[in-house]
Every structure is written in C-alpha cells, then in structure tokens.
Amino acid sequence: MSASPLKVAVTGAAGQIGYSLLFRLASGSLLGPDRPIELRLLEIEPALKALEGVVMELDDCAFPLLSGVEIGSDANKIFDGANLALLVGARPRGPGMERSDLLEANGAIFTAQGKALNEVAADDIRVGVTGNPANTNALIAMTNAPDIPRERFSALTRLDHNRAISQLAAKTGVAVTDIKKMTIWGNHSATQYPDLFHAEVKGKNAAEVVNDQAWIEEYFIPTVAKRGATIIDARGASSAASAASASVDAARSWLLGTPADDWVSMAVLSDGSYGVPEGLISSFPVTTKDGNWSIVKGLEIDEFSRGRIDKTAAELADERKAVTELGLI
C-alpha cells in the first residue's frame, strides 16, 4: 500500500448523508483495498462538535486505509490539496419553501465553495455535487471556479439511475447486474426522465422486454422521479444512505472508468448534445475513462423521449435564469 493517499473533501460531513458516506469512503468502497484515503471534512461552526463525534467513530473503526482526518469550517483549509470534493452539504428545503427559495439559499454556499476550490484544490480535482438542487448548485460552483476545467464538475443523478435499475429489475424478475445502459436525462428533480428505451435486460431492449407503455409512463417514470418524496413520507427523513451509496458509485465510476458494455448517468456540462442547451448541467448517458467522461453519442430519441428531455431541460434553463438574476453566476 505504497500509493499516496487520495485527499477526499466532504462538505456537510456531520449530516445524515455524510454520516453514511464517511464510513464507506474510509472502508475502501471508493478505490478498493490498496489506496489509502485522507478525509478532509467541512462543516458549519454549530455542527463541528457533532462532527468531532463522527471522527471519534471513524477512529474507533481502525480503518487500515484511513490515513488521516482533518475537520474545520474554513473551506480554504479543508479543500487544500483535495483530489476529490464531494459537496454534500446544502441548505435543506423547509416547509413552504419553493425551489427558487432553495436556489437562493444555496447560492451563497456554492459560490464560496467554488471560489475556495479554485484557489486551493489539487490540479487533478474532481467535484461531485450531491446537495440539492444539485444540478444548479454544481453550475454555481463551476462558474465560481474559472481556473478548474469545467468538465471536472458533476452533479449526482446516480441515485436516480440506481433507483431506475432497481425498479426495472423488480419488474422483469432479473438481477440488477443483468441491466445495462440505463439513462437518466436532465435535472435531479421530479422532471427527470428515466429512459428505458436504450436500456438492456440481459442484452435485450428493456422497453421491448417490459412491453407495457402504460407501466413505463404511469408507474416507472413517476416512481423513480418521486422516490425521494416517497421515502420522506415513509421514513420521516430524506434518503441518506442510498444517496451516500450513489455518491460513492458515481465517484468510483468517474475515477476508475465504466465497463466496455455499459454506461452510467452523470449530470455534466451540456455541449448541446440531444438538444439540451449548451452550458446547462444536465444528466446524460456517459462513459468514463482515466478520470474523464464522454457523453454517449448517436442514440435515437423518439417523440415521447423528446418531450420528456425538453421538459426537464426547460426546468434547468429556468433555474439557470433564476440564479443569473440573483447574480450568482
């Protein structure tokens, strides 16, 4: 185990997602049993005492791969030299808050974090945004980090991707490993479009295997898109462990690459592919290699899918307009 530790910064580290995420990272779930990890944990001042308790638990696990932990409330110190930043912390949506209120509340957070990353992160930094509204938070952070290549920023739609795989596996009676080429298009919101029409079940087209357009439209798409709200209703709290697991999955795929016969969903900077306006952070089917992603090209988009992709892209454009008017980008 001679490799130098990967410096992983996590924001909102004492929160619910952070609590699930840190132990996965420290145990080697990200890069396997041979690469040590140094955790750099950012929290707001009132949460630092709770974070100290989490660090005690990390210590008590005696993880062989955990080479060190640093905590603090100063982003410039915590992000210093970071190779991977997982921006989990965000202002939660409270009762009566509209999404526009959420955009404004989180704008200041991601503006400051983008600037700090720009100043002190390592040259090979990759930034994954989990905190909602994730796509536009990623856009704000990216815009405030002009010296970091824009393709180094991504927002999390892997949770939606995993949810879609799980639902399709249950419907078709196969293992989740039998499903390939699932795609989430657009925003990590209720407008997202989980696309079965290019997915495969044991090598066969998923939509043809399902052979039930009503199920796709009336059950599959809304179940995946609104799963977070359903979990809140059942659990009394938002999905934390699954979001943490998806954050690890997404970072691992980004850093280590996708299999030759599969792709993943990542919200990345649009180059205009599939009619999604250039400059938005939108989810696409992507392949990854050597820490870089590429949007899968050449997929046929039917009329049904076109309408869904356009709808979620329009929401992203509205969010971009809102944060532009707020002076955040």
Curated annotation (Swiss-Prot):
This is Malate dehydrogenase. It holds the Pfam family Ldh_1_N. Its EC number is 1.1.1.37. It comes from the Bacteria. The keyword Lyase does not apply. One of its GO terms (biological process) is malate metabolic process. It catalyses: (S)-malate + NAD(+) = oxaloacetate + NADH + H(+). GO terms for molecular function: L-malate dehydrogenase (NAD+) activity. NAD(+) binds at residues 12-18, 106, 113, 130-132. PROSITE patterns: MDH. Gene3D superfamilies: Lactate dehydrogenase/glycoside hydrolase, family 4, C-terminal, NAD(P)-binding Rossmann-like Domain. The active site is at residue 188. Keywords: NAD, Oxidoreductase, Tricarboxylic acid cycle. InterPro entries: L-lactate/malate_DH (IPR001557), Lactate/malate_DH_C (IPR022383), Lactate/malate_DH_N (IPR001236), Lactate_DH/Glyco_Ohase_4_C (IPR015955), Malate_DH_AS (IPR001252), Malate_DH_type2 (IPR010945), NAD(P)-bd_dom_sf (IPR036291). Belongs to the LDH/MDH superfamily. MDH type 2 family. Catalyzes the reversible oxidation of malate to oxaloacetate. It is an enzyme of class 1 (oxidoreductase).
